[in-house]
A protein has these predicted regions:
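Conserved ABC transporter NBD signature motif
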Residues: 55-66, 70-71
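Conserved ABC ATPase "signature" region
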Residues: 95, 99-122
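Conserved ABC ATPase signature
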Residues: 126-133
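Catalytic Walker B motif of ABC-type/P-loop ATPase nucleotide-binding domains
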Residues: 151-155
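Helical segment within the ABC ATPase nucleotide-binding domain
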Residues: 165-178
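ABC ATPase "signature
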Residues: 210-211
Length: 241
């Protein structure tokens, strides 16, 4: 994914201001920032949910503005709140998404995802019968069913228990190792530090820091010992406010 001068305005309010970055295959980028920084707006623009006011977004070389259908086929966006169909079972959700993306021979993949996300015994259950964590797992399983090349997560661990958190982290890492480009936004900086190789920090819609975790930590430490990503984040955002 390549993003160049991404800008999103709501009337006179500039929510995202000339944001540029890239995410290579196999890379996990952490998008972080204070509340109201423009993270969710950025993710929704990248996914084509809210078209940008200006700038270019290329998904695997495909311009999102010029060919939105082809570009969106290559990605999956998992928002912070599961959006499910009230009258579709767990299994039917996966079938619906697979058919929507014209996924060939998806049945084996469907069964594998149900097992991976511990939903096998819930395949005939409706959303009203699922816990918050199970709904989160189902939403992400639906995002994985068509094997997208770009994965966009907004707070992927919400509602998960400790075992679910561990397995979700393993699932994200596995997709990156298989060649997916991953963008992950979270307020859990220890999660970002654990999973991501690159971090983009935004504030008031602008990029204020961008680089590998080690580069950002070194920038703050300046040879005076190691610092955590949390400490680096707090210092960088304080300087940018």
């Amino acid at each position: 994914m390549e993003v160049t001068n991404l800008t999103k305005n709501y009337g006179s309010v500039v929510a995202v201001d000339s944001l540029s970055f890239s995410v290579n295959r196999g890379q996990i980028l952490g998008l972080v920032g204070p509340n109201g920084a423009g993270k969710t707006t950025t993710l929704r623009a990248l996914a084509g949910v809210h078209p940008p006011t200006d700038g270019q977004i290329r998904i695997c070389g495909v311009d999102l503005r010029i060919d939105p259908v082809d570009a969106k086929k290559r990605l999956a966006f998992m928002p912070d709140e599961p959006r499910l169909f009230d009258y579709l079972t767990v299994e039917e959700h996966l079938q619906f998404v697979a058919r929507l993306y014209q996924t060939d021979d998806y049945h084996a993949k469907l069964d594998a995802l149900l097992e991976e996300f511990e939903l096998g015994d819930k395949r005939k259950a409706l959303p009203t019968e699922l816990s918050r964590g199970m709904k989160q797992k189902l939403m992400i399983a639906c995002g994985f069913i068509h094997s997208p090349e770009v994965l966009i997560f907004d707070e992927p661990l919400t509602g998960l228990d400790p075992l679910g958190i561990r397995r979700m982290k393993e699932s994200i890492i596995r997709r990156a190792k298989d060649g997916a480009s991953v963008i992950l936004s979270s307020h859990l900086l220890h999660l970002v530090e654990e999973l991501c190789d690159t971090v983009l920090i935004i504030q008031k819609g602008r990029r204020i820091a961008y680089g590998t975790i080690e580069e950002l930590k070194w920038q703050i430490a300046q040879g005076r010992g190691d610092v955590s990503l949390e400490e680096a984040f707090l210092r960088i955002t304080a300087a940018g406010s």
